[in-house]
């Protein structure tokens, strides 16, 4: 059975992000990325990052199969996102230049290297961040961190 974790806080301010859809907040729960509700999402057209802390998960006891996932939609041609993983304020993984399609929500994922996963020493202090490379509008319906046999979720919408 996968381990499912919801966000417990926003790191910094979420004021630059609009909440779209009934009852949408940065920290509410959502469906799994495999069956998302794209009617509720957050959006930003300033190139601002959003960083959210995940509920402390159990250690997955392995350094393979750890993936950052995002379901988002862009509004510009050539728009890219960066997906980042932090332990506290220390960067663990930074994957920029992920091209996204304009106009419709799609799933994007990046597997974290074994070396990056091995550098995690405190699974109770993990944050996920997404940011657009441009000031084109970025809509995000789900962020999650998935372990091969456990899923650690951070949802940004409902």
Language-model regions, residue ranges each:
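Enriched but not universal
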Residues: 1-11, 17-19, 148-158
């Amino acid at each position: 059975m996968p381990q499912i974790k919801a966000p417990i806080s926003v790191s910094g301010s979420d004021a630059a992000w609009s909440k779209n859809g009934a009852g949408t907040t940065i920290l509410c729960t959502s469906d799994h990325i495999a069956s998302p509700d794209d009617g509720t999402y957050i959006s930003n057209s300033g190139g601002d990052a959003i960083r959210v802390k995940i509920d402390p998960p159990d250690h997955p006891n392995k350094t393979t199969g750890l993936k950052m996932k995002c379901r988002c939609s862009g509004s510009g041609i050539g728009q890219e996102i960066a997906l980042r993983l932090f332990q506290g304020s220390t960067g663990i993984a930074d994957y920029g230049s992920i091209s996204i399609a304009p106009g419709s929500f799609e799933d994007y994922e990046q597997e974290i290297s074994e070396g990056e996963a091995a550098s995690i020493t405190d699974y109770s202090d993990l944050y996920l961040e997404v940011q657009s490379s441009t000031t084109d509008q970025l809509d995000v319906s789900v962020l999650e961190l998935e372990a091969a046999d456990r899923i650690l979720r951070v949802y940004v919408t409902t």
